Amino acid sequence: MDGILVASNLRLADLLAEIDRYRPGRVRCDAAVANLRVSGTYPLDDTDRILDTLRETLPVDVEYLSRYWVTVVAARD
């Protein structure tokens, strides 16, 4: 499917590496959450929405140093 990323039990680090290709700047994954598993379909034309969805469904936070430098880290309690 064009414009859609389909993930089936994909490592979070691998999903974010793929998202990084479709977004200006950089998306990085902290080692503490890199091996979390992700499944779903994600629209590549809205990477912010993907990051929001990950934050809502996984124990992660999304830290924006700027619009162009994003890191996904373990959620704080």
Regions found by a protein language model. Give the residues of each.
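A residue-level detector for the "anchor" residue at the start of short, highly conserved motifs
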Residues: M1-D77
